[in-house]
């Protein structure tokens, strides 16, 4: 697995920090987070770029009781069973990606999704305070992450915001490369 801690700074000022908020996030942070949540299925194509990536996401619980990989698109406070957790005020941890992710595409796609959230003032909804590994069936309407690479590539292909941010030619080339790898695997 892999994760990224995300905050936005203006000089020495953390723009994601709001000490008056219960989780310590500013309105800006929530909108940025909303963009990441909205685009999560498409981001999965960058964050989980191999067939084995989806074996990790869909892995059964281990002896510890968890795979420590998210499978639902959700966020929470300091709880590692969700795709996004807020461990401390002023930042959030995105837990979706794995070690096969290209670090440059990872950062660029998080920024593109976050900027979409800021531009469109996307509300991420309420955080869920539960153990998603045990309680996921209580949330049947909660969006799930793609089960396979080809599903996330299809989401990316049809995501106008990501196509605008990266350019359609770059997205098409990325998808073509991943599809060639899928074809070789089969």
Where are these regions (language model features)?
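Acidic, glycine-enriched catalytic cores built around paired aspartates
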Residues: 130-186
